[in-house]
């Protein structure tokens, strides 16, 4: 219902919204076309696809959940060139491919749920609804919702600020953000994989194993991210050229990518620490870290760095934020974990 209302409001106020976000007369038509297909028409299928996938994974059906996500992603990759180049739909083709792929994922998950009818606790029947768990769901999910909302707000701010330098920086940043998102999505996959392990061991009081799982995940994310950084730094220009052959945008984007990728390892670890706290049921602590990182630091620093340094200052902002937040995140985790250990020792003595 929330997604439906958001999609409707986005459609009604699409013109002032796109103008506020920095769409120029040259790019307004493309932006509006993408917005209508992906957000207005594709918003509900996108949200349903994500929700059904996470519900499957939460019940231990990780393989079909991953298959559903992969199905939508692979279908999107196949449809993109067909619609963009084959049917000459340009930006609208990419948007249609994304919307249709998410709808196909929803159909896939519905079929899976029908097949798992006797092995799943998920039901849409109203008689099973209860307010008993609403508070717990919101408590744990608040940090993720806050991270997504503030992350989108940060992107809106940087697109708005970069639009003051022309369409080329906006295009270059948009491509860099997509490339930069790939290693972060790998980290998100790690998060979804290790959260049940952390949660189960934390609930069982097996803190030694919980810490081992957490630190292993953090180290893995750090090593994988470092490999991506090396790749992006060494091959920034050809990577950008794959997305856009236009020389000026490609060159500017390569410079952006070499800077932006430096923040990826620290961002990955900060993400994992926040999700570790969520898995421990510490939604408040996780939300504090998220708000501090995106709200208190990122957005104000974007504006400040743009004022003091200019266009490149905004690109350096993410690295600065992650450097500041890493010791804060780690300190929050250690404080929370040590508090729980002390509490348990006291209970054992009693």
Residue ranges and their predicted role:
Residues 1-42, 86-142, 198-263, 305-350:
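Short alpha-helical transmembrane segments in multi-pass integral membrane proteins
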Residues 14-17, 79, 153-166, 194, ...:
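Hydrophobic/aromatic end-of-helix segments at the C-terminal termini of transmembrane alpha-helices
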Residues 1-11, 46-65, 172-230, 234-236, ...:
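Small-residue-rich hydrophobic transmembrane alpha-helices
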Residues 38-57, 65-76, 94-109, 191, ...:
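Short runs within selected transmembrane alpha-helices of multi-pass transporters and secretion channels
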Residues 72, 101-105, 109, 113, ...:
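Transmembrane helical elements of multi-pass membrane transporters/channels
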Residues 61, 90, 146:
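Conserved Sensor-2/SRH helix of P-loop NTPases
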Residues 8, 16, 51-55, 74-82, ...:
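Alpha-helical transmembrane segments of multipass membrane proteins
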Residues 5, 9, 40, 44-45, ...:
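Residue-level hotspots within pore-lining transmembrane alpha-helices
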């Amino acid at each position: 219902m929330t997604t439906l209302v958001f999609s409707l409001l986005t459609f009604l106020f699409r013109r002032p919204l796109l103008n506020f976000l920095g769409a120029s007369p040259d790019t307004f038509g493309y932006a509006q076309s993408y917005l209508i297909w992906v957000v207005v028409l594709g918003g509900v299928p996108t949200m349903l696809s994500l929700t059904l996938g996470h519900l499957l994974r939460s019940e231990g059906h990780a393989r079909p959940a991953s298959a559903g996500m992969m199905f939508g992603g692979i279908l999107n990759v196949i449809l993109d060139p067909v619609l963009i180049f084959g049917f000459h739909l340009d930006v609208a083709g990419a948007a249609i491919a994304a919307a249709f792929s998410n709808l196909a994922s929803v159909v896939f998950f519905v079929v899976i749920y029908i097949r798992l009818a006797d092995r799943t606790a998920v039901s849409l029947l109203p008689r099973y609804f209860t307010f008993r768990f609403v508070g717990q769901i919101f408590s744990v999910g608040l940090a993720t919702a806050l991270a997504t909302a503030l992350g989108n707000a940060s992107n809106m701010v940087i697109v708005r600020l970069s639009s003051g330098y022309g369409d080329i920086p906006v295009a270059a940043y948009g491509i860099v953000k997509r490339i930069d998102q790939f290693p972060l999505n790998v980290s998100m996959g790690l998060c979804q994989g290790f959260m049940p392990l952390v949660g189960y061991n934390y609930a069982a009081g097996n803190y030694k194993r919980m810490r081992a799982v957490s630190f292993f995940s953090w180290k893995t994310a750090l090593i994988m991210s470092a490999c991506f950084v090396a790749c992006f730094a060494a091959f920034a220009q050809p990577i950008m050229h794959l997305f856009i052959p236009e020389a000026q945008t490609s060159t500017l984007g390569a410079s952006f990518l070499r800077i932006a990728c430096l923040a990826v390892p620290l961002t990955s670890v900060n993400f994992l620490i926040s999700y570790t706290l969520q898995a421990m049921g510490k939604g408040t602590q996780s939300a504090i870290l998220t708000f501090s990182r995106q709200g208190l630091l990122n957005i104000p620093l974007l504006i400040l760095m743009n004022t003091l340094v200019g266009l490149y200052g905004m690109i350096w902002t993410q690295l600065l934020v992650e450097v500041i937040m890493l010791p804060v995140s780690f300190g929050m985790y250690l404080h929370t974990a040590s508090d729980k250990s002390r509490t348990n020792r006291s209970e054992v003595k009693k």
